[in-house]
C-alpha cells in the first residue's frame, strides 16, 4: 500500500535560500506540499494560518531560534499544532545534546550538510 504524500504538508523553517530551495525541491519531488518560514517570527504565524503535518526546523534561524520556536509550538493551546513532529536541522549538532533537543520538544534531528536520502526517510517516518 503506498502512502499518499500529496495530502501531506511540510513547513520548512530555514533562513538559507540555498538550503530552503534544495529541501523544498527534494520534498516536492516526493509530492509533499511545502509551506515556508524564513525566520522564527514566521513559524507560529504559518502554523496558525496553514495546517501542516510536520515541521523541519533550522535551529539557527533569525528572530527566534529554532529551539525557542519549538518550545512555543509545544506550549501552543491547539493540539493540531503542539503535537506536530518537529525535525531539527542544524550544522551545530555538537552544540546540543539529545537531552536538550528533547527538552525543547524536538522529535528528531538531521545534521547539516543535509543528506537528502535521510531527509526523505525521516520525513516519511513521521508523516508517511
Model segments located where?
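Acidic catalytic/metal-coordinating carboxylates
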Residues: 39, 65-72
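Active-site beta3 strand of CheY-like receiver
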Residues: 51-56, 61
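Short hydrophobic/Thr-rich beta-strand motif most characteristic of the beta2 strand and flanking loop
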Residues: 31-38, 45-46, 110
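The feature encodes the CheY-like receiver
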Residues: 62-65, 94, 113
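Conserved acidic carboxylate
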Residues: 14
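Charged docking surfaces used in two-component/phosphorelay signaling
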Residues: 21-29
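C-terminal output helix
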Residues: 114-123
